[in-house]
């Protein structure tokens, strides 16, 4: 670097230290992007800019990356560690050519790779985004705009403290040299690809231009679909067309968002304070997959599970910090109260009524509004379960919004539409006490400002929060596979509902929920809750609890549930100490040590957290249950039993294993239990290991309540084969409540009618019921007997006594 540049950089650093405050995306690029610090690194920036270069320098040094202003040595000669892909702006024009010095460096590096087979330099495309404010609809500015000196100065004043250093995945120059050669044309190609990449990054970060709200309403009013229903409504109600048109405008006002970037930017500071006050940390996983989709131009639909009202804020906050545009969020109309409603609306919320039934005008307007969001390229978010889960389990999907998403595709969208399942988890859900009261029968309290204030007074440290992005689902690919002729149903005017729509939407919904559960985050509290709720009297010595946590951790690490599920990196001792600090357990000391237990109220609340991850342990728990019951059992017998029971677990817990994968995964779990010395193996025979029988019993207990529910329903079917769906659900629920009361099963979902509904549907799907819904006893009886054998004598006696009383 020349002396002049060195002096210039020194003079710039002081004002930039005051004017510029940057965040890096990703926040840990060395780990997230797998950057190898042992291999040479060269940075590629979009424009020649000393301000950008110094901003990158500060960020790189903070992140542990090489200083871009330190030279790189090639064959004994020192060269700059950076290239610019265009000369960039001058005072009155812009030169988009690749600078000669950058071209020369590219040629030198590529030739070095041609001459040295072991050379493998890393090219890291890096851009500095000065502000992320989207433009206004109708304006035409480039997505990544070069700035001359005066423009850059103004930008620093306006957005210097709202800047982002965007670091992209590494490009291997060894790969480029081997596959594309090392001549000058490749250098130009690299520069062109980088420019496209930088522009897509900018669009992904700021999003499409925002519409004028009134212009949007006028455009919707003129759409053929809404105009048609307005005329039909006026005619059927015998009122003036203008009156219906005003109603339509009022509905649009009720629904539509009023997105404000300034609220997002300023709200980010408040939310940062809030998360620091509430949580000891936020754990975000697999965000790079979503960034890639955004940069490739996908229409992204986020479909998170719904644990808490906090989900609305948390996901938008996380996406903003991951360099993505916060989505337009479908929120229940119950949240449209002052002052929260207007704030949510400016933060991207659009409001939806609980039911569209009988209101054709509303349903048409809402459908057209959603289609407009997709057509303009705004990312959208809606909660897959419809409402918040009160039990901690993933609920069956509500398919209305999903169906409208597919219908929007049938309007002729020219971009791929991709669902991004999101698992959101907490070590404390603020509403969990309220959920417990509602499950006991208390009426749900309507959301209001007073409720918000009461919640704010309870703010304290709630441990860790988790946002795991699951495996994306391409709707285009799914439709191509399951409805190959779907494009024939495209109609830009009328909403379509072809014959294939309902089964395809149901299939997508099930896949969506499965991918959410695949991305589950086990944590200190959920693991402790799982162990303590499996113990007699809901109590364990500290040593036993630590050992059980270690058992769970080994299962999750050695037989990973999925590629997107996450497991704590800490050991069992550290997890337990962290969980104890959350102040949810009773800690007692005696002469033998410490006992960790749950009081009755906390036992009820802890079922919520256990249910977050119960699916992770469904199969190992069932294997343990079979070994505990039989003392000695063959692997083949275990495989046969699990094949019978698995379809019910799969439907209830959204397990992802296919039938052909089941044998292999069961064998893997058996191997793990043998490895942990929980069971002993002699050839094909398994038996209890008395030295570790306590740990095996605790593992086995996790699935016990699920099997008890199955036994209840199957016993009713055996006794009354012609029992209808509603009667079976009602009678099973009554018996489950009796069992819960008599045997201290302090878990509200144990007698949840919805769970019995899923069981009934699975019985029908699997052929245990005939076309009329009557039990096929030749199939029901063997299954019922197999499951009954796994129950304790006390539970079996209670079920028998209740059935005798009913008779």
UniProtKB/Swiss-Prot annotation:
Keyword Lipid metabolism: yes
UniProt similarity note: Belongs to the GPAT/DAPAT family.
Cited HAMAP family: Glyc3P_acyltrans
Main subcellular location: membrane
Protein name: Glycerol-3-phosphate acyltransferase
EC numbers for this chain: 2.3.1.15
Catalyzed reaction equations: sn-glycerol 3-phosphate + an acyl-CoA = a 1-acyl-sn-glycero-3-phosphate + CoA
């Amino acid at each position: 670097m020349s002396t002049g540049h060195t002096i210039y950089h020194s003079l710039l650093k002081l004002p930039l230290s005051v004017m510029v405050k940057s965040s890096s995306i990703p926040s840990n690029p060395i780990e997230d992007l797998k950057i190898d610090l042992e291999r040479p690194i060269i940075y590629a920036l979009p424009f020649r800019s000393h301000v950008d270069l110094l901003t990158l320098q500060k960020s790189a040094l903070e992140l542990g990356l090489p200083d871009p202003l330190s030279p790189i040595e090639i064959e004994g000669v020192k060269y700059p560690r950076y290239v610019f892909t265009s000369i960039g702006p001058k005072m009155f024009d812009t030169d988009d050519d690749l600078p000669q010095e950058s071209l020369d460096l590219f040629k030198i590096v590529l030739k070095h790779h041609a001459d040295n087979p072991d050379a493998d330099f890393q090219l890291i495309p890096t851009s500095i985004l000065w502000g992320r404010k989207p433009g206004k609809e109708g304006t035409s500015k480039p997505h990544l705009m070069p700035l001359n000196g005066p423009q850059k100065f103004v930008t620093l004043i306006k957005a210097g403290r709202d800047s982002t250093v965007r670091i992209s995945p590494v490009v291997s120059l060894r790969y480029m040299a081997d596959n594309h050669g090392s001549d000058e044309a490749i250098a130009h190609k690299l520069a062109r690809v980088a420019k496209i990449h930088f522009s897509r990054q900018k669009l992904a970060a700021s999003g499409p231009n925002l519409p004028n709200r009134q212009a949007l309403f006028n455009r919707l009013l003129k759409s053929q679909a809404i105009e048609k229903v307005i005329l039909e409504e006026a005619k059927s109600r015998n009122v003036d067309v203008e009156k219906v048109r005003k109603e339509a405008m009022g509905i649009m006002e009720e629904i539509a968002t009023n997105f404000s970037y300034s609220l997002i930017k300023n709200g980010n500071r408040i939310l940062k304070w809030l998360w620091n006050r509430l949580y000891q940390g936020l754990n975000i996983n697999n965000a790079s997959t979503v960034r890639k989709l955004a940069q490739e131009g996908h229409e992204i639909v986020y479909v998170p599970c719904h644990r808490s009202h906090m989900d609305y804020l948390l996901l938008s906050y996380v996406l903003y910090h991951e360099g993505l545009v916060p989505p337009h969020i479908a929120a229940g109309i119950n949240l449209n109260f002052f002052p929260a409603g207007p704030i949510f609306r400016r933060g991207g919320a659009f409001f939806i009524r609980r039911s569209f039934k009988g209101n054709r005008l509303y349903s048409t307007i809402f459908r057209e509004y959603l289609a407009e969001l997709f057509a303009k390229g705004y990312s959208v978010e809606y909660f897959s379960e419809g409402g918040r889960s009160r039990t901690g389990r993933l609920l069956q999907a509500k398919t209305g919004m999903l169906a409208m998403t597919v219908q929007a595709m049938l309007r002729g969208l020219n971009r791929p539409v991709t669902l991004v399942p999101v698992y959101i988890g907490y070590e404390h859900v603020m509403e969990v006490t309220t959920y417990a009261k509602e499950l006991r029968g208390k009426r749900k309290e309507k959301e209001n400002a007073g409720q918000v204030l009461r919640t704010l007074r309870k703010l304290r440290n709630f441990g860790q929060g988790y946002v795991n992005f699951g495996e994306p689902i391409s709707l285009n690919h799914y439709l191509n596979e399951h409805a190959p002729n779907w494009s024939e149903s495209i109609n830009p005017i009328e909403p379509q509902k072809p014959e294939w729509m309902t089964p395809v939407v149901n299939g997508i919904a099930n896949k969506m929920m499965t991918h959410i559960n695949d991305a589950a985050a086990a944590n200190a509290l959920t693991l402790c809750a799982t162990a303590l709720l499996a113990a007699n009297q809901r109590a364990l010595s500290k040593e036993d609890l630590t050992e059980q946590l270690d058992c769970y951790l080994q299962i999750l690490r050695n037989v990973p549930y999925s590629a997107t599920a996450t497991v704590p990196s800490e050991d069992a001792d550290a997890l337990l100490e962290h969980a104890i600090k959350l102040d949810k357990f009773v800690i007692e000391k005696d002469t033998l040590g410490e006992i960790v237990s749950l009081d009755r109220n906390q036992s009820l609340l802890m079922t919520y957290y256990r249910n977050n991850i119960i699916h992770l342990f469904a199969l190992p728990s069932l294997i343990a249950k079979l070994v505990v019951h039989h003392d000695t059992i063959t692997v083949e017998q275990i495989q046969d039993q699990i094949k019978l029971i698995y379809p019910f677990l799969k439907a209830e817990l959204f397990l992802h294993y296919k039938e052909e994968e089941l044998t292999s995964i069961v064998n893997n779990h058996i191997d793990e239990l043998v490895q942990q010395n929980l069971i002993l193996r002699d050839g094909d025979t398994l038996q209890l290991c008395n030295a570790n029988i306590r740990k095996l019993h605790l593992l086995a207990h996790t699935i016990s309540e699920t099997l008890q529910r199955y036994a209840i329903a199957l016993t009713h079917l055996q006794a009354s084969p012609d029992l209808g769906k509603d009667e079976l659900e009602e009678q099973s629920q009554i018996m489950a409540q009796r069992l819960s009361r008599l045997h201290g099963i302090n878990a509200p979902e144990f007698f949840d009618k919805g769970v019995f509904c899923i069981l009934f549907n699975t019985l029908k799907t699997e052929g245990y019921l005939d076309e009329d819904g009557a039990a096929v006893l030749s199939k029901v009886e063997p299954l019922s007997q197999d499951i009954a054998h796994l129950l304790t004598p006390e539970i079996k006696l209670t079920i028998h006594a209740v059935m005798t009383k009913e008779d």
